[in-house]
Design a protein with these regions (language model features):
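N-terminal leader/targeting and assembly helices and adjacent pre-domain segments
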Residues: 1-156, 247-277
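Acidic, glycine-rich two-metal-ion catalytic cores of nucleic acid-processing enzymes
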Residues: 155, 159-260
């Protein structure tokens, strides 16, 4: 059974991007007041990164991203469990276990996401400085340095904001689903793509509708003979909107079904798969 509500909502990603772009605007203002002084720009960005208001802001925007994701994830679990679970008793137990794990999961994701965003000012500054050093070899006038600092700050900060918003919303969703699956003893999920046509990577397209064990993340790139970028679960790599659909009941999928096992995708019967769970 394919339950579409596991699919990630774009609204949370868009709201998170707006919050990150506000930081980009502040970085651009720091670049303007720094003029052509690269060292002053670096120092100001580092000072901003170490400030209490910055800490408060990133914790706030991360909380506003993680909390609705966790709420949606819980609601999706509740509905999927009701559809998949034939026993009312089992459904009740499932819901109780989910409730107990929610706060811990939310707190964990807030901490990890805030840590990632924390270094955004210094990371942006370092990229700008590297660009300035490269351009300096060709000889730059003072006014060109000033404009370059501003342009590169905008370019790098906006690009980072887009990457973080897309990647971290997806990774947070994946982490929440994985944590709750493990709490409930559910070891398998179905890898789903967002079905964006040509926008889906070839390596991810081959993983669509494949059963994957949480204990054995695949290396999709190796399956299509591309450069290996490591082993990871659905939605757990940069610029990926794939998502995991937990296998709550073995009859939630049609058999025989594709299964990732021993580094390859195999068509497997229900009886054979039953030996793995």
């Amino acid at each position: 059974m394919k339950y579409d509500q596991w699919k990630m909502t774009r609204r949370i990603e868009e709201d998170f991007l707006k919050s990150l772009n506000f930081l980009s605007t502040l970085f651009e203002k720091i670049a303007i007041i720094s003029g052509n002084d690269v060292k002053a720009f670096q120092n100001k960005m580092q000072t901003f990164q170490n400030s209490v208001p910055y800490d408060n802001y990133i914790n706030d925007i991360v909380k506003r991203m993680v909390t609705p994701l966790a709420a949606r994830n819980y609601e999706t679990w509740r509905k999927a469990a009701r559809v998949s679970t034939r026993s009312h008793f089992l459904y009740t137990v499932l819901m109780e276990e989910l409730k107990q794990g929610i706060k811990k999961d939310i707190d964990s994701q807030i901490i990890s996401n805030a840590a990632l965003i924390k270094t955004l000012p210094s990371d942006t500054a370092q990229k700008v400085v590297r660009d300035i050093e490269e351009y300096a070899l060709s000889g730059l006038r003072v006014e060109e340095i000033e404009k370059l600092i501003q342009d590169k700050t905008r370019q790098h900060s906006r690009a980072s904001a887009r990457l973080i918003a897309r990647t971290e919303v997806s990774k947070t969703t994946s982490a929440l689903t994985k944590a709750r699956s493990e709490e409930l003893g559910l070891r398998w999920y179905v890898w789903r793509t967002m079905e964006d046509g040509d926008r889906v990577r070839k390596s991810h397209r081959i993983m669509n509708d494949v059963l994957v064990s949480w204990n054995n993340p695949p290396s999709p790139e190796l399956l299509v003979k591309e450069k290996d970028v490591g082993r990871y679960h659905a939605g757990n790599i940069w610029n990926c909107r794939c998502y995991s659909e937990p296998l709550i009941d073995i009859d939630d999928v049609k058999w025989p079904h594709k299964v990732y096992i021993n580094g390859s995708i195999q068509k497997m019967s229900k009886a054979r798969f039953s030996l793995l769970i």
